[in-house]
Amino acid sequence: MKILIASNTAWYLWKFRLSLAQALRAAGHEVVAVAPRDGYAPKLAEAGIRFVDVPMDNAGTSPARDLLFLFRLLRLLRREQPGVYLGYTIKPNVYGGMACRWLGIPSIHNVSGLGTAFMKKGALSRIACLLYRTGLGRATRVFFQNNEDRSEFVGLGLVPATVTAVLPGSGVDLDRFAPRAGPSREDPGPVRFILFARLIWDKGIGEYVAAARQLQREGLAAKFQLAGFLEVKNRTAVSRTDVDSWVREGVVDYLGETDDVRSWMAQADCVVLPSYREGTPRSLLEAASMAKPVIAADAPGCRNAVKDGVSGFL
């Protein structure tokens, strides 16, 4: 069977869905990765996954650009004639679902978090509901990463309950993210906190910096580190100016970006994620796999990854 796997970035497919794509290929299926081309498209090709570039305006709200993306998906699906479409991230879910509905192609979607549009009620949330209802209303199956997100979608009438299921997260390779033997680092030094995330305000970056500033004022011997993609295409992106200002102030250290967080996580004493809302956060699963305590917001998704008072604190 030919299976199309679509996302808003090739990076996402390489980072989170490569093992799935390889398992499907090993089972005898033909797998096609669909996303806008970025620096990770060649990595997918090197792994044996055929990549198709479908440009899209990932974070924009232009109806014209979104209609163009829908047209590109329709054209691709007609040409490829897949047996099933797997959709990840917002626009490939919404517009991929619409295209599959019109062409009679089975579609399976993974809603990994509800995002900014569902945090505040208003025009944006009403438009998001309309798009999701149209895109996912006839889906073959829709997976959510926590029960709260599933209940909200079903309660709003966006998807029938009968096609929904909860798949708690993307999973973690326990062999790759294994606890390190011995001390976490050579020098005891101050306590090290680290936050791994795309640098957007919804991840609680502002709260993390404010907490770091307050604890430093109180005299706590600690280092506060940030790691993740900066200047992402998102309405709530943290600016480089803000990060540079915090670094100059001495409140946080910005480590940059990496494809492998294990060495940084191994050096940390505690992993922090004060996010406003998540599906099931991968960084907390990876931290738990490496036996690192965590501090997370008592918010949808985060609370599913932490046993309060045992593996960390909410």
Regions found by a protein language model. Give the residues of each.
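Glycosyltransferase donor-sugar binding loop
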Residues: 35-39, 196, 223-238
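A short alpha->beta transition loop at the rim of the catalytic pocket in nucleotide-sugar-dependent
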Residues: 262, 269, 291
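Nucleotide-sugar donor phosphate/pyrophosphate-binding loop at the beta->alpha transition
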Residues: 14-16, 64-71, 106-108, 116-138
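Conserved donor-binding/catalytic core segment of Leloir-type glycosyltransferases
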Residues: 183-203, 208-213, 225
